[in-house]
Amino acid sequence: MSIAILSAAAPMASRTADSARAGDPDSAAPYTVQDGDKVDLKTLDGWKTWRALACERCHGAEQEGLVGPSLVDSLKTLSKEDFHTTVINGRPEKGMPPWGASEMVQKNWEGLYAYLKGRSDGKIKPGHLHPLAQ
């Protein structure tokens, strides 16, 4: 009986309130993570996009901010839609370039959001990520 209860509770451990502002506590996290460094393929592609575009130059290697803001903090309140708008259009008045012309960003922005949301939620560790075992 205990095993069934524990296994039923396990999926809940990786869930977050992605749309907490909408008051939806059952909203699933946009990522799947195991052991802090094994993630689903979409989230892994988001991490690869982060690395390829060298976002750490402004936001820090652990997303805690440098000249750009801490994304660990920002993603606690920033909606997915606002994240998309910010990444695509940039915030030139604050020094962030628009990334809308990047094919990689267009293809992987949701994975990038998932990666950063996982970092913000404290579920994804900083550093190198690996794919979940299939």
Indicate where each model-derived feature is located.
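Bacterial Sec-dependent signal peptides at the C-terminal "C-region" and cleavage site
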Residues: 7-19
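Flexible coil segments in periplasmic/lumen-exposed cytochrome c-class electron-transfer proteins
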Residues: 17-44, 52-53, 97-134
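Short cysteine clusters
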Residues: 55-58
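Gly/Gly-Pro-rich "capping" loops immediately C-terminal to redox-active cysteine motifs
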Residues: 37, 43, 47-48, 60-101
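Bacterial N-terminal signal peptides
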Residues: 1-7
